[in-house]
């Protein structure tokens, strides 16, 4: 996996998160993918379950903003750092929550993610 392909995948990830399109979400992952939302919890297993987990608690349209970039790519593995920001409404004039993120991902040869683990840290004092 080349760095440019990881960047393309991250762009598609952001678009899928913004749209909540089941097709766009599903296209990111292999059929048997595993997704760790939290390192101390069981992962979500399988593309269908991952799509369903994304669709459970949707943010209002236009309130999410993500910026992510690969910091290391080795074969089919990538480590990504970025920021997830959430706003009061779609004007994005009032930031309500944000997290610094690290993703560790493994891809298949077609560029679909087969393993996704994320860690996130909120600013001190954020509820």
Model-derived regions, located:
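A beta-strand edge to alpha-helix "cap/lid" segment located at domain peripheries
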Residues: 5, 51-127
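Hydrophobic pocket/interface hotspot
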Residues: 13, 25-26, 33, 46, ...
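A short gly/proline-enriched turn/hairpin at secondary-structure junctions
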Residues: 34-44, 57-60, 119
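Structured beta->alpha junctions
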Residues: 14, 39, 70-72
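Short, low-complexity N-terminal intrinsically disordered segments enriched in polar/charged residues
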Residues: 1-31, 127
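Short hydrophobic/aromatic segments of transmembrane alpha-helices and their interfaces
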Residues: 32-34, 96
């Amino acid at each position: 996996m080349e760095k440019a392909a990881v960047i393309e995948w991250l762009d598609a990830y952001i678009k899928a998160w913004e749209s909540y399109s089941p097709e766009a979400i599903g296209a990111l992952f292999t059929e048997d993918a595993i997704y760790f939302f939290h390192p101390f919890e069981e992962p979500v297993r399988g593309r269908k379950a991952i799509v369903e987990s994304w669709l459970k608690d949707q943010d209002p349209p236009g309130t999410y903003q993500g910026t992510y970039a690969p910091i290391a790519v080795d074969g089919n593995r990538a480590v990504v750092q970025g920021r997830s920001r959430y706003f009061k409404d779609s004007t994005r004039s009032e930031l309500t929550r944000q997290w610094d993120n690290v993703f560790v991902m493994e891809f298949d040869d077609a560029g679909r993610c087969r393993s996704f683990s994320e860690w996130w840290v909120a600013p001190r004092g954020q509820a």
